[in-house]
């Protein structure tokens, strides 16, 4: 019997924790990742894991592991080797380091501790955790689906070590932590992790002396227990006498896992009647007293329960910390697959299969579904089948699992019996069954043995009871039981009515659609799934039974608020007829006979809070069958546009995965009534834009308006947008503002706009950073196509939300700027070093050039962004900010993090008045495209007097990390490196080209460096010493890898030394790598190229023309305000400017709003000739400040560059103030 049980546990991959009997598949992996790593079978799987961790595409699959290892530096391999541990095969591996000291989500590493390198290695299944707000106590524990007004912030993401951190509002440490979430999402996994981490000395040792873990399903088997017996059950090994344990109740933590599973009512008894700790009492009374604080009021508790069960579970829970488990991130989903199939040679094939089906990848955010999918793939391998999964729902995946595991149809009768057992258990809230329970139900001994062997059932080793492998699996079998019963019912609708009554009695009408059993039931009533059931059970189901049962379950939900659970049920069902009938009956239509414009406060704009990829998928799937005409996915800092009713606004505060974007856009291929889509404020990767444009090109897509404001789009995305414009005739309005498209990107858009099939009538984009040539192309397009209106306002490249006086979120410098500017094509433009804010550019002052110190005086509350540095501040009032450029080498070498973290952005020393800055964006150069790097690996390092502090950013965007309510010191972004991966991190890089003319010979210097403003500035200053001038050319489009080598080549015979460039990070104070290129005669031009040395693919090229080569500009002289005798450049050359400026109107457009008022602007324009306009302009300039004349000079340089260059050469300098 023992041997059989051991074999059964091996086959079913049962993971157990001490006395815990409940199997959670998130602990179930096939083998430990590092077992026999040197064997040839493991090499391919280890390579697969590297590819999963880095998000490498399948094109890298033929790279030998040995070659990858050789390319990692010695230090990385040493760290990797030390950090790997051989784990029990039942544990799920998720490598990472957890610092020893935590304080409000920060880790402090003092200089003395840094030498010791006290890193604690953990192997946790990493889950997404959302700390939820609970302002009014626990009277509203369940998240509602519909919101009549704009919802408040939904909380913030935390990690396992933050569960007992003080409340941000009260600063009190919580005594009660509720771990909530959907079925199978990983609540029990998290609870076990807390216990195991405490056992291993990694978490909460300073707070708790004793931690007790209890499975409530097991506790429910006990009739009575004393407090002493309860404590004894919670310890694997007795550690101290009970009296000693109870002497310090504030040091105790009780973990109650699955407190909602048993059918008990936890009632707190009268404190005056409390019995002695050694006296037995009913278990539900004992637990109720613990929760009600009648006994051990100072003790802490952690509960796990499904979200829908919380409200009725305990009437009053005081002020708990509520943490919702959101499942796996996309990164962890892929990682799980690799670790499950650690030794299989087909690991890469499996990954490509799963990655190619984004719906499956989205479903796998639920850890239980991850296990289910991997089990199905494993069964297919064992049976020699071609690996193929086309399941679109969890129900379909469960049926696939059943068909792969049930050995033939001879067990169909016993399988029906097992379904009846499951349904009876669900109705009675029982998950453990005795041997007699199974026999009474009619299960034979051989059938029980078979179900144990294939893993559907499992035996509890600490008792004689049995359970299903997972509660969700029991609920699936229960759902099949209801269909089997209804198909056998001989009394017409009585079976349907009885089923619905049973479900309502068990779950309640309000939570009916949240119950997994009901979702499975709706999924089984799909035509395809019913055929699969017929094959499994060798029977036929009457189709009228299906239709009647569907309508009985759905009932009349249309008069009630829409439930997110109902969307889940409809998604599981997938029947178009039912979806259309149900969704068209929702009260989403406008109040009048005609469609009307709706603001966000109108009742016909519905709001729904979604937290996970799965929720986003099911909601957008169902919306395509409804009356909804406008859909907004609200991102951070998004401007509110008017939506056409009926409309829906989806609120989400957690990142959206690549797979989820693909699913969402796939749903848009046939939109029926949906005409407007607003994705503003949501970062879109290159692949996401590609999926979006693919959907928009489909004939069934009816979208007419698309808002993509501040989505992190680059010129690389514009090829897809242009192709979409050429093929999609319905799209009439496209908003691309606050995206860094550049000249190349806009030129690609112009190609799409020229296509006769393009029906676009309104295009909004920023033109402030575009060249005059591109702006001319846009104007020519408007002239050629009178129906096309290209709208532009000047504004910063990024925006962030600020709060107005009503506490509502608004977008700084967007709508207000549009009104101020009159929506002109050209707006005033400052230099790249300026900070762009609500009232225009704000100049940056040089405090000490040698020490790289600068100052900016922000004049009012709002959002300010500097394109040159990438810094972004949100301030509540006027404030002066000092900014210093620092070098990481000054600070990082004194900490142990130089081996575990890599520099991910520039280091700034920022000083500002405390409380004036509510948010700061710190730039980073790590590429987040394609989901290759997990954003949870980012930290912001603060270097303070007492040591270094690592802070977790509030969020990480494609180009910057956001800190809210920051404190300032030397600070910058770091990225935690994954052990054994080393420096294989994709980064955004730039090329810098400098030249020097000597007679007819030209010398070029070519650099390839990370996109770091401090490095760029250091190179600029070094090259200037030798009179080299920089040429601006576009950077590489694709992300590159640190440590990679590239071949420098040219279209002409030139001398290049060296001929290879390595992309590496060097501190700004160190010498940077470059190639020197000697050209005798440039002729008509020269083409420079960089080619990947390993894969020989072209990664960058640039054409250098003779027109790019101009004499070096003399350094601009500083002109302080107390030196009036020094004339400004525009005053020195007044006569020449009046005579030679040939195009005054563009010049006036640039000065309008900054230098010229509306009245001055019109007065100058009213003059007849250009010379008269210039004379009028100079007459008004007598009252201008030096700053105004600086703006005049900048405008002249933009509109008449050749004239300004000629004047500079003749005068030998220019007097403006930097």
UniProtKB/Swiss-Prot annotation:
Signal peptide: none annotated. Residues 969-1118 are annotated as: UPA. Residues 835-1118 form the FIIND domain. Residues 77-87 have a biased composition (Basic residues). InterPro entries: CARD, CARD8/ASC/NALP1_CARD, DEATH-like_dom_sf, FIIND_dom, Leu-rich_rpt, LRR_dom_sf, NACHT_NTPase, NLRP_HD2. The record marks 968-969 as: Cleavage. It is an enzyme of class 3 (hydrolase). GO terms for cellular component: cytosol; neuronal cell body; NLRP1 inflammasome complex; NLRP3 inflammasome complex; nucleus; protein-containing complex. Pfam families: CARD (PF00619), FIIND (PF13553), LRR_6 (PF13516), NACHT (PF05729), NLRC4_HD2 (PF17776), NOD2_WH (PF17779), UPA-FIIND (PF23679). Acts as the sensor component of the Nlrp1a inflammasome, which mediates inflammasome activation in response to various pathogen-associated signals, leading to subsequent pyroptosis. Inflammasomes are supramolecular complexes that assemble in the cytosol in response to pathogens and other damage-associated signals and play critical roles in innate immunity and inflammation. Acts as a recognition receptor (PRR): recognizes specific pathogens and other damage-associated signals, such as Val-boroPro inhibitor, and mediates the formation of the inflammasome polymeric complex. Belongs to the NLRP family. This is NACHT, LRR and PYD domains-containing protein 1a allele 4. The lineage of its organism: Eukaryota, Metazoa, Chordata, Craniata, Vertebrata. The gene is Nlrp1a.
């Amino acid at each position: 019997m023992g041997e059989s049980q051991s074999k059964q546990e091996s086959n079913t991959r049962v993971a157990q924790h001490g006395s815990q009997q409940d199997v959670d598949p998130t602990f179930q992996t096939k083998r430990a990742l590092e077992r026999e790593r040197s064997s040839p079978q493991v090499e391919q799987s280890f390579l697969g894991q590297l590819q999963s961790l880095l998000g490498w595409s399948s094109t890298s699959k033929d790279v030998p592991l040995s070659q990858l290892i050789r390319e990692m530096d010695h230090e990385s391999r040493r760290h990797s080797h030390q950090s790997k541990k051989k784990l029990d095969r039942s544990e799920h591996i998720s490598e990472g380091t957890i610092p020893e000291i935590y304080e409000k989500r920060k880790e402090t590493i003092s200089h003395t501790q840094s030498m010791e390198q006290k890193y604690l290695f953990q192997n946790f299944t990493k889950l997404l955790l959302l700390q939820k707000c609970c302002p009014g106590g626990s009277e509203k524990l369940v998240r509602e689906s519909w919101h009549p007004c704009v919802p408040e912030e939904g909380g913030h993401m935390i990690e396992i070590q933050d569960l007992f951190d003080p409340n941000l509002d009260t600063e009190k440490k919580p005594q009660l932590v509720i771990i909530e979430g959907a079925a199978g999402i990983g609540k029990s996994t998290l609870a076990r992790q807390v216990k195991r981490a405490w056992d291993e000395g990694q978490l909460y040792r300073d707070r708790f002396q004793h931690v007790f873990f209890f499975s409530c399903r097991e506790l429910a088997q006990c009739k009575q227990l004393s407090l002493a017996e309860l404590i004894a059950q919670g310890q694997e090994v007795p550690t101290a006498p009970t009296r000693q344990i109870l002497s310090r109740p504030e040091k105790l933590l009780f973990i109650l896992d699955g407190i909602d599973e048993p059918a008990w009512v936890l009632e707190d008894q009268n404190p005056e009647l409390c019995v002695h700790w050694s006296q037995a009492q009913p278990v539900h009374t004992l637990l109720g007293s613990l929760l009600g604080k009648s006994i051990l009021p100072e003790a802490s508790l952690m509960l796990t329960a499904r979200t829908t069960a919380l409200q009725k579970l305990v009437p009053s829970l005081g002020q708990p910390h509520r943490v919702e488990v959101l499942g796996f991130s996309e990164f962890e989903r892929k990682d799980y697959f690799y670790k499950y199939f650690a030794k299989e040679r087909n690991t890469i094939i499996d990954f490509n299969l799963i990655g190619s089906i984004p719906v499956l990848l989205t479903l796998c955010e639920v850890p239980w579904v991850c296990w289910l999918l991997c089990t199905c793939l494993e069964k297919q391998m064992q049976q020699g089948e071609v690996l193929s999964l086309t399941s679109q729902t969890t129900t379909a995946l469960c049926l696939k699992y059943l068909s792969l595991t049930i050995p033939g149809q001879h067990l169909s009768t016993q399988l029906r019996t097992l379904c009846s057992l499951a349904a009876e258990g669900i109705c009675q809230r029982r998950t453990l069954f005795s041997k007699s329970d199974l026999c009474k139900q009619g299960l034979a001994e051989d059938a029980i043995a078979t179900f144990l062997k294939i893993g559907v059932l499992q035996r509890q080793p600490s008792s004689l009871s049995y359970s299903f492998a997972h509660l969700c699996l029991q609920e699936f079998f229960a759902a099949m039981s209801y269909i089997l019963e209804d198909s056998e019912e001989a009394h017409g609708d009585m079976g349907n009515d009885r089923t619905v009554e049973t479900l309502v009695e068990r779950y309640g009408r309000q939570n009916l659609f949240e119950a997994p059993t009901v979702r499975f039931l709706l999924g089984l009533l799909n035509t395809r799934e019913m055929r699969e059931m017929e094959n499994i059970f060798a029977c036929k189901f009457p189709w009228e039974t299906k239709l009647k049962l569907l309508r009985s379950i759905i009932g009349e939900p249309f008069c009630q608020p829409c439930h997110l659970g109902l969307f889940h049920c409809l998604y599981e069902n997938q029947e178009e007829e039912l979806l259309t009938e149900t969704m068209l009956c929702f009260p989403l239509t406008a109040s009048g006979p005609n469609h009307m414009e709706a603001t966000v406060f109108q009742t016909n704009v519905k709001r729904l809070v979604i937290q996970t990829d799965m929720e986003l998928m099911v909601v957008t799937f169902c919306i395509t069958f409804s009356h909804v005409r406008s859909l907004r996915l609200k991102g951070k800092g998004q401007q509110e546009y008017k939506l056409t009713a009926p409309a829906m606004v989806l609120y989400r505060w957690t990142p959206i995965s690549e797979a989820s974007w693909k699913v969402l856009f796939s749903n848009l291929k046939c939109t029926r009534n949906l005409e407007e889509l607003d994705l503003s404020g949501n970062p879109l990767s290159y692949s996401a834009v590609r999926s979006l444009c693919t959907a928009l090109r489909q004939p069934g897509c009816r979208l007419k308006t698309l808002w993509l404001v501040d989505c992190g789009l680059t010129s690389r995305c514009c090829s897809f947008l242009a192709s979409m414009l050429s093929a999609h005739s319905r799209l009439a309005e496209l908003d691309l503002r606050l995206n860094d498209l550049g000249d190349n990107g806009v030129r690609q858009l112009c190609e799409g706009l020229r296509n006769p099939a393009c029906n676009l009538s309104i295009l909004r984009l920023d033109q402030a950073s575009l060249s005059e040539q591109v702006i001319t192309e846009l104007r020519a397009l408007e002239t050629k196509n009178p129906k096309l209106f290209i709208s532009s306002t000047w504004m910063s490249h990024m925006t962030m939300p600020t709060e107005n006086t009503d506490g509502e979120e608004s977008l700084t410098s967007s709508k207000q700027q549009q009104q101020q500017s009159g929506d002109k094509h050209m707006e005033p433009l400052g230099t790249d070093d300026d900070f762009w804010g609500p009232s225009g550019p704000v100049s940056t002052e040089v405090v000490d050039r040698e020490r790289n110190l600068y100052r900016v005086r922000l004049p009012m509350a709002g959002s300010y962004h500097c394109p040159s540095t990438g810094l972004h501040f949100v301030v509540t009032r006027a404030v002066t900010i000092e900014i210093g450029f620092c070098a990481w080498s000054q600070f990082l070498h004194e900490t142990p993090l130089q081996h575990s973290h890599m520099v991910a952005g520039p280091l700034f020393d920022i000083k500002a008045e405390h409380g004036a800055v509510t948010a700061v964006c710190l730039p980073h150069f790590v590429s987040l495209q394609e989901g290759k790097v997990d954003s949870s690996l980012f930290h912001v390092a603060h270097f303070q007097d007492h040591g270094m502090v690592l802070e977790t950013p509030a969020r990480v965007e494609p180009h910057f990390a956001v800190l809210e309510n920051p404190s300032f010191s030397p600070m910058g972004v770091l990225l935690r490196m994954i052990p054994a991966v080393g420096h294989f991190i994709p980064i955004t890089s730039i090329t810098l080209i400098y030249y020097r003319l000597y007679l007819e010979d030209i010398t070029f210097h070519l650099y390839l460096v990370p996109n770091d403003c401090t490095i760029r500035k250091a190179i600029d200053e070094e090259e200037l010493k030798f009179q080299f001038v920089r040429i601006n050319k576009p950077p590489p489009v694709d992300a590159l890898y640190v440590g990679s080598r590239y071949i420098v080549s040219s279209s002409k015979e030139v001398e290049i030394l060296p001929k290879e460039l390595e992309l590496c990070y060097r501190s700004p104070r160190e010498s940077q790598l470059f190639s020197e290129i000697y050209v005798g005669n440039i002729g008509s031009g020269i083409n420079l190229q960089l080619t990947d040395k390993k894969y020989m693919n072209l990664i960058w090229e640039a054409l250098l023309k003779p027109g790019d080569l101009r004499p070096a500009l003399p350094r601009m002289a500083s002109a302080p305000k107390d030196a009036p005798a020094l004339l400004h450049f525009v005053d020195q050359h007044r006569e020449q400017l009046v005579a030679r400026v040939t195009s005054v109107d563009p010049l006036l457009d640039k000065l309008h709003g900054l230098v010229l008022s509306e009245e001055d602007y019109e007065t100058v324009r009213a003059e007849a000739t250009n010379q008269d306009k210039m004379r009028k302009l100079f007459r008004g300039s007598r009252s201008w400040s030096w700053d105004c004349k600086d703006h005049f000079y900048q405008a002249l340089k933009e509109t008449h560059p050749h004239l300004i260059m000629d004047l500079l050469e003749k005068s030998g300098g220019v007097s403006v103030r930097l």
